[in-house]
Regions:
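Extracellular low-complexity, O-glycosylation-prone Ser/Thr/Pro/Gly-rich "stalks"
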Residues: 1-2, 35-37, 41-43, 49-134
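Structured domain cores in non-transmembrane regions
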Residues: 1-50
Length: 134
């Protein structure tokens, strides 16, 4: 993509593929103001799309389980926190990928949270549109 995508904004990426040779697409993106939330989908078929046709899907937000969701600035690598993100020395991981429950912000009563109400999200948390242009 073209960098940071703010809440409610969008980005557009054009790729060239030969659908008879490479008929599937995988996409992934991290929610930057979290320590380990992401969206991702693998194996999206491009083979049946006709020129001008689009496919759209809503994507759920996943928690990668690499660390505790404490919303502290020290653990959030995005602009809201500036922290280090993952650190193997910490022992707060659970190694299980699961649906993300969302974040708790200062506005929700977590006084030491690096996040505010504009960082909240619900599932689904992203939308992907694939359009065949030629």
């Amino acid at each position: 993509g073209n960098g940071l995508v703010l809440p409610g904004a969008s980005d557009e990426v054009t790729i060239t593929v030969d659908p008879s040779r490479y008929g599937y697409l995988s996409v992934a993106s991290m929610f930057v103001n979290t320590n380990d939330a992401f969206v991702g989908e693998t194996g999206l078929s491009l083979k049946s799309l006709a020129v001008g046709e689009s496919y759209q899907m809503s994507m759920n937000v996943w928690d990668s389980g690499t660390e505790l969701n404490d919303e502290l600035a020290a653990t959030i690598p995005g602009p809201a926190g500036g922290g280090e993100g993952f650190n193997a020395a910490r022992n707060d991981n659970n190694d299980v990928v699961a649906f993300h429950a969302g974040v708790i912000s200062q506005d929700d009563g977590l006084a030491n949270s690096a996040l505010s109400a504009n960082h909240r999200f619900l599932n689904p948390g992203a939308k992907v549109t694939i359009t065949r242009v030629e």
